[in-house]
Amino acid sequence: MTYSASDLARSAGARFRQALADEHPLQVVGTINANHALLAKRAGYRAIYLSGGGVAAGSLGLPDLGISNLDDVLTDIRRITDVCDTPLLVDVDTGFGASAFNVARTTKSLIKFGAAAMHIEDQVGAKRCGHRPNKEIVTQGEMVDRIRAAVDARTDENFVIMARTDALAVEGLDKAIERAVACAEAGADAIFPEAMTDLAMYRKFVDAVKVPVLANITEFGATPLFTTEELDGAGVSMVLLPLSAFRAMNKAAENVYAAIRQDGTQKNVVDTMQTRAELYESIGYHDFEQKLDALFAQGKGK
């Protein structure tokens, strides 16, 4: 979607909220870098996503175990928001620090760097991927404090603060819903129940929390690959596909590297590649080149 000047005058958070109002459920697709953000925008997505696991694996080559820090995430946010105006939802793990001050700093920094929304979770600092076993969570009270700290710190009232709970795997469905309700009452704008295993679970969250609910439909995890239509029927407001393009990109790279190593040439895999013309179109290369040509022409005319 292309935004008008009046649209861009509104904050990223306001544009995210508008997308949420306009599209039900709102598809939010993962964009591992600025180039992928532009591709997602070109494909028509109204909201995009930066995964914490994606930052760890894609930018740092590390596992999603709480190793990356706020600066790592801000670097990738800035690169995306510098070139793409599609509103960006960001994974901030547990808030990048043990205190409310850390959560506040994270919230303010995301707004400064152009993010539209964030989700913060209730795992302990030494966190794990939400679809892995042996997760540990903080108390409900500590999670509520994280939400309150984020809400109190935001400098844009439209910036969306989402509470993610991993409690299903640790305490069961009823306790997970209880946490979600408490987070919504503390000011969370939306709820992200992680690793749900059936549609009825989403419906129970929707009925209980009275704020938008996000479904994380990640591949190779605990949650079946429900369709957008199925999730709409369960009352879900947002459908997140966090790493689909990243996984496809990685597999494509593996295939290209293996083919060139084996064949001694890229000829056999060229037809699987994005062309130079397609890349130039997606990043607006010719617009930049025309401006450069105009500058050179002005210089020669003096």
From Swiss-Prot:
Entry binding sites for substrate: 51-53, 129-130, 164, 194, 216-218, 247, 276
Induction: By propionate.
Reactions catalysed, as given in the entry: (2S,3R)-3-hydroxybutane-1,2,3-tricarboxylate = pyruvate + succinate
GO biological process, one term: propionate catabolic process, 2-methylcitrate cycle
Pathway assigned in UniProt: Organic acid metabolism; propanoate degradation
One term of GO molecular function: magnesium ion binding
UniProt cofactor(s): Mg(2+)
PROSITE patterns, A to Z: ISOCITRATE_LYASE
Domain of life per record: Bacteria
Record keyword Metal-binding present: yes
InterPro entries: ICL/PEPM, Isocitrate_lyase_ph_CS, PrpB, Pyrv/PenolPyrv_kinase-like_dom, Pyrv_kinase-like_dom_sf
Mutant lacking the gene: phenotype: Cells lacking this gene show an accumulation of 2-methylisocitric acid.
Record: residues binding Mg(2+): 91, 93
EC number: 4.1.3.30
Family that this chain belongs to: Belongs to the isocitrate lyase/PEP mutase superfamily. Methylisocitrate lyase family.
Primary role: Involved in the catabolism of short chain fatty acids (SCFA) via the 2-methylcitrate cycle I (propionate degradation route). Catalyzes the thermodynamically favored C-C bond cleavage of (2R,3S)-2-methylisocitrate to yield pyruvate and succinate via an alpha-carboxy-carbanion intermediate.
Record-linked NCBIfam families: PRK11320.1, prpB
Protein name: 2-methylisocitrate lyase
Species this protein is from: Cupriavidus necator
Phylogenetic placement of the source organism: Bacteria, Pseudomonadati, Pseudomonadota, Betaproteobacteria, Burkholderiales
Gene: prpB
